[in-house]
Regions:
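Active-site donor-binding acidic/aromatic loop of nucleotide-activated sugar
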Residues: 117-122, 135-144, 150, 201
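Short hydrophobic beta-strand element within catalytic cores of glycosyltransferases
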Residues: 180-183
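Conserved donor-binding/catalytic core segment of Leloir-type glycosyltransferases
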Residues: 70-87, 93-96
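A charged, aromatic-enriched C-terminal amphipathic alpha-helix characteristic of glycosyltransferases
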Residues: 219-248
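A short, active-site helix/loop in glycosyltransferases that binds the activated sugar's phosphate group
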Residues: 12-40, 45-50
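Short, structured helix-loop element that forms part of the nucleotide-activated donor/catalytic region
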Residues: 22, 109-135
Length: 250
């Protein structure tokens, strides 16, 4: 946002941006911030916390099938994120409507809680799902503390936000454990996918491209190579180096 609070944050000697898209946003909206004062340091995750090839425990899987028996023996498409109009849930519903007859084994999982203020929107979505005959095709599992397990358990993860993500950490976490991600070509998500899994990139709001990408992943499951970028260590090292540089200027 371009409020006064955000403007104050651009008055420091150096401004850290978590992606190139944030660098561009600051440059365009905060003319008083010299471009040379903006330093791009990508956010990072721990490869130890999200190891390539990670699989949930048998106990977790058994409990999940007990809680959500409709997920068993399904091709799972996961949309992570809180319940808000910004996260692209309507796009997921349309996608499932288009795919359900051709792929009866396909099931969507929405991982994310709904703030009490969003209760009306959640009901609106559920009514939409019901009217389209998709109640047994889309499962809302609510807010979860075991996001790593859900990302690894899913066959494909979607990133369909209506606005550009500043970074897209959940996209990176999914790719890190080896789950393919399909997402719009904008913001931090596009930067991650371009570097790690370019076949998951689709043009913004191109519904037919999204449909085809999901079909391709169902018909021929893809492998994600181990992620060697965007580590927590890199982020910390670059941040400390920047602090040392700023201190040396005094």
């Amino acid at each position: 946002s371009t409020n006064r609070y955000s403007a104050i944050m651009t008055q420091a000697e150096k401004v850290i941006a978590v992606s190139d898209s944030v660098v561009q946003y600051i440059t365009e909206h905060y003319k008083n911030c010299p471009p040379e004062d903006i330093v791009r340091i990508y956010r990072g995750i721990s490869p130890q916390e999200f190891p390539h090839g990670y699989q949930p425990s048998a106990q977790w899987i058994n409990q999940t099938f007990k809680d959500f028996p409709q997920l068993e023996n399904k091709f799972l498409v996961c949309l992570p994120g809180r319940i808000t109009r910004l996260k692209g849930h309507e796009t997921l519903i349309e996608l499932m409507q288009q795919l359900q007859s051709q792929y009866p084994n396909l099931h969507a999982v929405v991982v994310g809680g709904a703030d009490p203020k969003k209760a009306a929107y959640l009901k609106e979505m559920q009514d939409n799902i019901h009217s389209k005959g998709l109640r047994d095709k889309i499962t809302f599992v609510g807010h979860r503390s075991d996001i790593r397990e859900w990302l690894a358990f899913s066959d494909v993860v979607l990133s369909l936000s209506n606005q550009a993500e500043t970074f897209g950490r959940t996209t990176l976490e999914a790719l890190s454990v080896g789950t393919p991600v399909i997402g719009w070509n904008r913001g931090g998500v596009a930067e991650i996918l371009s570097s790690v899994y370019p076949q998951g990139l689709i043009e913004v709001d191109d519904q037919s491209a999204l449909l085809n990408a999901v079909k391709q992943h169902i018909d021929q499951p893809r492998k994600v190579k181990p992620v060697t970028m965007f580590s927590l260590k890199e982020m910390c090292d670059q941040t400390i180096d920047l602090y040392k540089h700023v201190l040396s200027l005094d």
